Amino acid sequence: MTCLYPGTFDPITNGHLDVIKRALKIFDEVIVAIAKSEHKKPCYDLEKRKELALLATQNLKNVKIIAFDNLLVDLAKELKVNTIIRGLRAVSDFEYELQIGYANHALWEDMETIYLMPSLKHAFISSSIVRSIVAHGGDVSSLVPKEILPFLKDQSCM
């Protein structure tokens, strides 16, 4: 069985990788679906975020990276995948994710959402925290995959 793990991944973090690895224990394949997310005004463009995710997951089997700019439910139908994985770091994430999960289910009755918590050591990591630390010249080597560190040196978008 295959699941979709959608997100902005701006940039992909060790927290994201942790959720991917946990999902692989449940599913045969994880499709990481990188959203255009113009409303979030991402730091990195869609192609760069996809490139970084490909680098970060290159050693993981059964992980596919795609980019999309349409409704998640439409993408899921197109791929014939009815299960979405979402990572939850804190209770504050749950309220938002629950609303999105209900909306997706309202758009497609077959759509299911499974919420996974990251490991405790990754529970505080977010892409926005990573961008903030980089913007202030801090070390994010423990927060992001080593494969993408060289790309974070360019702080022009942070």
UniProtKB/Swiss-Prot annotation:
InterPro entries recorded: Cyt_trans-like, PPAT, Rossmann-like_a/b/a_fold
Cofactor(s) named in the record: Mg(2+)
Keyword Metal-binding assigned: no
GO MF annotation list: ATP binding; pantetheine-phosphate adenylyltransferase activity
Residue numbers binding ATP: T8, F9, H16, G87, L88, R89, E97, H122, A123, F124, I125, S126, S127, S128
Positions contributing to substrate binding: T8, K40, L72, R86
Catalytic reaction equation(s): (R)-4'-phosphopantetheine + ATP + H(+) = 3'-dephospho-CoA + diphosphate
Keywords attached to this entry: ATP-binding, Coenzyme A biosynthesis, Cytoplasm, Magnesium, Nucleotide-binding, Nucleotidyltransferase, Transferase
Top-rank EC class of the record's enzyme: transferase
Site label Transition state stabilizer, positions: H16
Gene Ontology terms describing biological process: coenzyme A biosynthetic process
A Pfam family matched in the record: CTP_transf_like
Known partners and oligomeric status: Homohexamer.
Function recorded in the entry: Reversibly transfers an adenylyl group from ATP to 4'-phosphopantetheine, yielding dephospho-CoA (dPCoA) and pyrophosphate.
UniProt similarity note: Belongs to the bacterial CoaD family.
Record-given protein name: Phosphopantetheine adenylyltransferase
The encoding gene: coaD
